């Protein structure tokens, strides 16, 4: 079984799209756990509608310390062998989870490609995932990881507010996990939200690389990435 964890907070505008994408999967051996951070809008009312429709949906609602706190709560509640994570403004492609599970034999982690939804509209562009390596990154929305691997790594390190998923992947590589890649779009990722905070993202990425990679490699990567960021800022002016 695949346990799908969705973190929410005041997500009434986008949540139905995410939940419908789970409900409409061709792969049906799943449970979906919504971990809500005590929303003040109609998020929980929407979740309750889906719980009534299908007993595979579950939820909790209580204050949390951000998305990775919610994700940690979720995997600890999970019953499935595999765990996946979805943002409340993201969605799965219809065949996405099936494609991962069809290629999961012998794997500890399996991941695929991603569509990106542009800011403030529904324009979508395709992004092929690069092979995961130490210091690299792939969208957690398009990745399935065995729950036991998450447990052995202690889950997400919540001191990283943006890229704790990258840190978890690095820890998973270090432990020698078997990671498989497939070339099929698994999810549609919305570029709105915390993950679009570019400079903070670069700083956090450097800290994670410093934890897992040789120092000079980290410095070189940081200079290159920061240089690209500054050039983009200048060109926009």
State each model region's role.
Residues 13-16, 41-49, 95:
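Acidic helix N-cap motif at the loop->helix transition within catalytic regions
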Residues 91, 95-123:
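Conserved donor NDP-sugar-binding/catalytic core segment of glycosyltransferases
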Residues 83:
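Short aromatic/hydrophobic "clamp" motif used to bind/position activated sugar donors
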Residues 61-78:
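Glycine-rich, basic loop-to-helix element that forms the pyrophosphate-binding segment
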Residues 1-3, 31, 167:
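Cell-envelope/extracellular polymer assembly enzymes that use nucleotide-activated donors
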Residues 28, 36-45, 87-90:
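A conserved acidic beta->alpha catalytic loop
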Residues 126-204, 208:
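Conserved nucleotide-sugar donor-binding catalytic segment
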């Amino acid at each position: 079984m695949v346990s799908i964890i969705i973190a929410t907070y005041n997500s009434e505008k986008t949540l139905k799209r995410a939940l419908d994408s789970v409900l409409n999967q061709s792969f049906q051996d799943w449970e979906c756990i919504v971990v809500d951070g005590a929303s003040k809008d109609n998020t929980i009312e929407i979740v309750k509608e889906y719980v009534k429709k299908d007993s595979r949906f579950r939820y909790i609602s209580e204050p949390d310390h951000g998305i990775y706190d919610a994700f940690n709560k979720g995997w600890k509640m999970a019953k499935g062998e595999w765990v996946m994570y979805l943002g409340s403004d993201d969605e799965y492609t219809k065949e996405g989870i099936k494609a991962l599970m069809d290629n999961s034999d012998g794997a500890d982690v399996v991941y695929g490609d991603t569509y990106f939804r542009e800011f403030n509209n529904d324009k979508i562009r395709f992004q092929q995932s690069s092979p995961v390596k130490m210091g690299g990154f792939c969208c957690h929305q398009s990745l399935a990881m065995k729950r036991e691997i998450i447990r052995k790594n202690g889950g997400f390190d919540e001191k990283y507010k943006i890229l704790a998923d990258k840190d978890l992947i690095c820890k998973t590589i270090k432990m020698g996990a078997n990671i498989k890649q497939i070339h099929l779009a698994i999810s549609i990722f919305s570029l709105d939200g915390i993950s679009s905070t570019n400079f903070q993202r670069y700083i956090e990425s450097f800290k994670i690389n410093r934890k897992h990679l040789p120092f000079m490699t980290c410095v070189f990567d940081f200079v290159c990435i920061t240089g690209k960021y500054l050039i983009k800022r200048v060109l926009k002016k």
